[in-house]
């Protein structure tokens, strides 16, 4: 999970649909397209990119509350897998708003030996619960479908990290501007699984020239 710069202007359909009450829809074409663009077509929780099963997720469950249901600031781009796991009651209203707060200030997203370690850096409830959620979307296997979907995300992360490590190796062997740019592109917040790559660089003193690209948004 990384910081997302979300458009401050709510899509017009939300206001229109809210007037319809319970029959209104927050899934208008303008909402879908704006969320897809703002979140770079990746799930805000697991950071899988190019979603085949995108869903519009409410950061705070609306439970029939029309203000929450149609609040642009409460709508996020998610995959079905992460949305289903976050729907556990224990997470209600306890997840970091990555459009207002930089999750990387509060959590380390570590990738080691083909596995993840999501470490909260403070004792705030939102930090603790967000770290737990990210861990669960990669590791929770309490149903048959979750076994498959969690494994798919772990494999996708492993593939992306292997590509990233190869780009770093290429750069170490030849520190050209072209090779540097190839690394920098994968450190952008818009990249797949950016939090894990950015944490990796942030914890490596030998990559001082890349630290400016993984700065935190305080």
Regions found by a protein language model. Name each.
Residues 45-78, 86-107:
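Histidine-centered nuclease catalytic patch
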Residues 82:
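DNA major-groove recognition helix of helix-turn-helix/homeodomain DNA-binding modules
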Residues 1-42, 65-70, 162-169:
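Short, charged surface segments at domain edges that flank catalytic/cofactor-binding sites
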Residues 18, 31-34, 50, 54-57, ...:
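Amphipathic, alpha-helical segments enriched in basic
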Residues 90-172:
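Conserved, surface-exposed functional patches that form binding/active-site neighborhoods
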């Amino acid at each position: 999970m990384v910081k997302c710069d979300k458009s401050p202007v709510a899509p017009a359909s939300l206001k229109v649909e809210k007037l319809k009450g319970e029959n209104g829809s927050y899934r208008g074409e303008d909402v879908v397209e704006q969320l897809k663009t703002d979140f770079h077509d990746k799930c805000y929780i697991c950071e899988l990119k190019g979603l085949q099963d995108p869903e519009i997720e409410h950061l705070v469950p609306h439970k029939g509350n029309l203000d929450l249901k149609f609040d642009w600031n409460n709508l996020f781009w998610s995959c079905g897998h992460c949305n289903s796991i976050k729907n556990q009651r224990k997470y209600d209203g306890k997840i970091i708003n990555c459009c207002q707060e930089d999750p990387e200030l509060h959590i380390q997203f570590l990738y080691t030996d083909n596995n993840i370690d999501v470490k909260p850096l403070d004792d705030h409830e939102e930090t603790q619960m967000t770290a737990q959620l990210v861990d669960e979307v990669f590791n929770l296997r309490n149903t048959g479908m979750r076994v498959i979907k969690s494994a798919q995300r772990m494999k996708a992360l492993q593939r992306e990290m292997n590509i990233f490590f190869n780009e770093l190796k290429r750069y170490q062997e030849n520190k050209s501007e072209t090779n540097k740019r190839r690394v920098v592109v994968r450190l952008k917040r818009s990249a797949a699984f950016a939090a894990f790559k950015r944490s990796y660089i942030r914890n490596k003193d030998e990559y001082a020239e890349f630290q400016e690209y993984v700065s935190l948004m305080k």
